[in-house]
Amino acid sequence: MTKKNFKPQGQRTVMGFDFGTKSIGIAIGQELTGSASSLKAVKAQDGIPNWDDIAVQVNEWQPDLMVVGLPLNMDGTAQEVTFKAKKFANRLHNHYAIPVETQDERLTTADAKARLFEQGGYKNLGKGKVDNMSAVIILESFFETSYGE
């Protein structure tokens, strides 16, 4: 991806990631509206994604900022996967030269499952769907934290 001119804060397109060791959920959102939509989840092996699959999404959506969910324990302390998520965030920045921030993602999986169940019952709870909905929630949380929406 070539270097681009980034939009000012409040007008950016933001790509969100729900990091996992087997699957990484992806969502795209707009700061202006504070809304987000899920994209296609990417499979990972021990937290390492197929970077070509991520590049397809990055090249299509041209985000100005990326946000990676940071899995923390309920008391706010780090766990093993927290460090892997931070490493993933650093690799995203190194691959695409796009600013990357992290966002607390405590309880997003439970929230994602509840939303998906509400929309379509148990049949709607596939792993990729949960990861993608988690990515949507991570972005929505980022927008709320950043702009108080």
Swiss-Prot record:
The enzyme class is hydrolase
Main function: Could be a nuclease involved in processing of the 5'-end of pre-16S rRNA.
Q: Which PANTHER family match?
A: POLYNUCLEOTIDYL TRANSFERASE, RIBONUCLEASE H-LIKE SUPERFAMILY PROTEIN
Q: Which Pfam families match?
A: RuvX
SMART domains documented for this protein: YqgFc
Superkingdom as given in the UniProt entry: Bacteria
Q: EC number(s) of the enzyme?
A: 3.1.-.-
Q: Which InterPro entries match?
A: RNaseH-like_sf, YqgF, YqgF/RNaseH-like_dom, YqgF/RNaseH-like_dom_sf
Question: Where is the protein situated, by its record's location annotation?
Answer: Cytoplasm
What's the main place this protein lives? cytoplasm
Protein's name in the database: Putative pre-16S rRNA nuclease
Q: Which GO terms describe its cellular component?
A: cytosol
Task: Spell out the molecular function terms from Gene Ontology.
Answer: nuclease activity
Keywords, ordered alphabetically: Cytoplasm, Hydrolase, Nuclease, Ribosome biogenesis
Family, according to the entry, reads as follows: Belongs to the YqgF nuclease family.
Q: Name one GO biological process term.
A: rRNA 5'-end processing
